[in-house]
UniProtKB/Swiss-Prot annotation:
<keyword id="KW-0396">Initiation factor</keyword>
<feature type="domain" description="S1-like">
    <location>
        <begin position="1"/>
        <end position="72"/>
    </location>
</feature>
<keyword id="KW-0963">Cytoplasm</keyword>
<comment type="function">
    <text>One of the essential components for the initiation of protein synthesis. Stabilizes the binding of IF-2 and IF-3 on the 30S subunit to which N-formylmethionyl-tRNA(fMet) subsequently binds. Helps modulate mRNA selection, yielding the 30S pre-initiation complex (PIC). Upon addition of the 50S ribosomal subunit IF-1, IF-2 and IF-3 are released leaving the mature 70S translation initiation complex.</text>
</comment>
<dbReference type="InterPro" id="IPR006196">
    <property type="entry name" value="RNA-binding_domain_S1_IF1"/>
</dbReference>
<keyword id="KW-0648">Protein biosynthesis</keyword>
<keyword id="KW-0694">RNA-binding</keyword>
<comment type="similarity">
    <text>Belongs to the IF-1 family.</text>
</comment>
<dbReference type="InterPro" id="IPR004368">
    <property type="entry name" value="TIF_IF1"/>
</dbReference>
<protein>
    <recommendedName>
        <fullName>Translation initiation factor IF-1 2</fullName>
    </recommendedName>
</protein>
<dbReference type="GO" id="GO:0043022">
    <property type="term" value="F:ribosome binding"/>
</dbReference>
<dbReference type="InterPro" id="IPR012340">
    <property type="entry name" value="NA-bd_OB-fold"/>
</dbReference>
<comment type="subunit">
    <text>Component of the 30S ribosomal translation pre-initiation complex which assembles on the 30S ribosome in the order IF-2 and IF-3, IF-1 and N-formylmethionyl-tRNA(fMet); mRNA recruitment can occur at any time during PIC assembly.</text>
</comment>
<dbReference type="GO" id="GO:0005829">
    <property type="term" value="C:cytosol"/>
</dbReference>
<dbReference type="GO" id="GO:0003743">
    <property type="term" value="F:translation initiation factor activity"/>
</dbReference>
<dbReference type="GO" id="GO:0019843">
    <property type="term" value="F:rRNA binding"/>
</dbReference>
<dbReference type="Pfam" id="PF01176">
    <property type="entry name" value="eIF-1a"/>
</dbReference>
Amino acid sequence: MAKEELIEFEGVVSEALPDNRFRVQLENGVEVWAYASGKMQKHRIRILAGDRVKLEMSPYDLTKGRINYRHK
């Protein structure tokens, strides 16, 4: 999939789940499942409940996403 096809959203992590997965509440009120991107896992960037994050989602499945940035 080309990078241009990804849709970016911002939201707040509502729950941290096992296996580096999270439940994220988007700005539009929808709750989705998300996982930390490979570079975030590699650099051991911690994501906790309440953190503001930016995630990308495929237009084909709007229930799952990949977290690619944690706001400070």
